[in-house]
Amino acid sequence: MKLVFYGAGNMAQAIFTGIINSSNLDANDIYLTNKSNEQALKAFAEKLGVNYSYDDATLLKDADYVFLGTKPHDFDALATRIKPHITKDNCFISIMAGIPIDYIKQQLECQNPVARIMPNTNAQVGHSVTGISFSNNFDPKSKDEINDLVKAFGSVIEVSEDHLHQVTAITGSGPAFLYHVFEQYVKAGTKLGLEKEQVEESIRNLIIGTSKMIERSDLSMAQLRKNITSKGGTTQAGLDTLSQYDLVSIFEDCLNAAVDRSIELSNVEDQ
C-alpha cells in the first residue's frame, strides 16, 4: 500500500506519525511533500525514515491513498498542479477544513473516490476523535483500509458529509472548548488563595485522572458523578451552585456558533 501526504503542517504530521508508528506499512511506501520548505520536509522525512519528493508524477504513480493536508486556500493551486498526474487507482483523503467532496472532485477534474476526515489535535497523542465521510463510489475494502489508517491516531465516527459540521464543532473544536473551561477553573481556584502553579498542576493531574476514570469505567459520566456526590457534602454544595446556571444553553450556543462557522467555510464557491 502506497501512501502520499500533501502538506506537512502540525495536524498532518500528527496523522502520518500515528499511521507510521501504528501500522505494518513499509516506510519505502510512504511519501511526504509540502508546499516549498524542502529543508524542513527532508529533515522530517529522514526522522521518520520515509520518502519525500516534489515530483507529482512520482508521488501519484501507484499511490493507493493520497492525503490532502494543505491549507484550504492553497488547494486550488495544488489541484491544478497535480490533476494531470492523477491515476484511476488514487483514492483521496482530505483533512482540509470546510472543503466539500464535490468541490474537491471538481477541482481535481476526476471522479476518483474522496473521503473527508475531521480529526482533532489529540491525534498528536494517538487519541483523536475523527469524523469521516466517504463519497458514494468507495468499495468496502478501501473504506475498511481507510478506517484502519485513521484508527492509528485515535477513534473513528462515520457520518454523512452534512454532519461533519457537527463533528467539527463537538470533537474538532472540542479540545479548545475544554481547555477554555479548564482555564477558568484555574482562575477560580487561584482566587481561593493557592499559588497559581499549585492550582495548575493540581488541575492538570485532576483532568488526567478523571479522563482515566472515564476510560476505564463502564459507567456513564452521570453515574460517575453521582458516585462521588454525598448528600449534604462539599461536592453537592458546589453542584447545587452550578445547577443555578444554564450550562446546557451556554454549550449549545458555543457548539451552534462553531457549526454555523463550519457551514460558512464550506461555501467555497462564495469565497
UniProtKB/Swiss-Prot annotation:
State the superkingdom: Bacteria
Its recorded reaction(s) are: L-proline + NADP(+) = (S)-1-pyrroline-5-carboxylate + NADPH + 2 H(+); L-proline + NAD(+) = (S)-1-pyrroline-5-carboxylate + NADH + 2 H(+)
User: Membrane spanning segments where?
Assistant: none
Which Pfam families does this entry report, sorted A to Z?
A: F420_oxidored (PF03807), P5CR_dimer (PF14748)
Family statement: Belongs to the pyrroline-5-carboxylate reductase family.
Q: Main role?
A: Catalyzes the reduction of 1-pyrroline-5-carboxylate (PCA) to L-proline.
Matching entries from NCBIfam families are given as:
proC
The name this protein goes by in its record = Pyrroline-5-carboxylate reductase
Tell me what organism the protein belongs to. Answer: Staphylococcus aureus (strain MSSA476)
Q: Which gene encodes it?
A: proC
